[in-house]
Amino acid sequence: MNKKEKRPTVLFFDSGVGGFSVYREAKKLLPNWRYLYCFDNAGFPYSEREEESIIHRTLAACQLINQRYPLDAIVIACNTASTVVLPPLRAAFDIPIIGTVPAIKPASEITKTKHIGLLATKGTVKRHYIDELIDKFAQDCIVERLGTTKLVEIAEQKIRGHSVDLISLKDELSPWAGMADLDTLVLGCTHFPLIKDEIQLCLPQVKYFMDPSAAIAKRIKYLLDDKNLQVQNEKYNQMFCTAHFPEESQFKKALHLWGFESLEVIKID
């Protein structure tokens, strides 16, 4: 690779590995870019944390990584964090900061029955900005909200090589099981596309699953293509976490399947 070649470096940040759903779409669209991924497992799950804590931890991690690997963009691949951290991040960095917003607008456009389900974390479904999105784009729809931490944990376990507990999943989704005309589901947490097939088994009436990951990848491309980028000599993608964890050795062995070369623990507390 020519040292003068401009190869964008993009950081994906989440409290867990849900952001993989966004990262994989970006890598599919832009395979030759350099990707860093940081998951704040010491602070997981963000849906259970106060806003100030989420802001502090996100800023600390992004600033630490940026000092070592100058970044061209940061993707907050977490719906919960995106509701609170984007303004302070944009104040701290002069690079594109891209958030994740539940796809309520496209869901309202594709639904045939005007009955939509928003599946997200407990923190996200309570945010005022969800009310604003529904008022702006889906006033003519019935929008069910289901906040869950259990599905986040199930997705985390799947990424780490465990089979999905369909009984627990079905139980968590049971409030919607009898809604025969619920035809559209907004996957309002980046973890949920990772278990979309299993969710579909539990809710067979749903025909449309709205995942913003591909749109985010296109947004990254639009913002960084032909821009003044950092010149990077490193050729590999790297992952960071904020604490050691029990299955770390097995997790490291599977990194190459996702296109990463190494996992490093960083301290942000």
Curated annotation (Swiss-Prot):
Tell me the pathway. Answer: Cell wall biogenesis; peptidoglycan biosynthesis
Might you give the EC number(s) for this enzyme? 5.1.1.3
- The kind of enzyme this is, by top-level EC class, is isomerase
Family matches, as InterPro entries: Asp/Glu/hydantoin_racemase, Asp/Glu_race, Asp/Glu_racemase_AS_1, Asp/Glu_racemase_AS_2, Glu_race
Sorted alphabetically, which Gene3D superfamilies does this protein's record hold? 3.40.50.1860
- Quote the function comment for this protein: Provides the (R)-glutamate required for cell wall biosynthesis.
Know the name of this protein? Answer: Glutamate racemase
| Provenance organism | Haemophilus influenzae (strain PittEE)
Q: Which gene encodes it?
A: murI
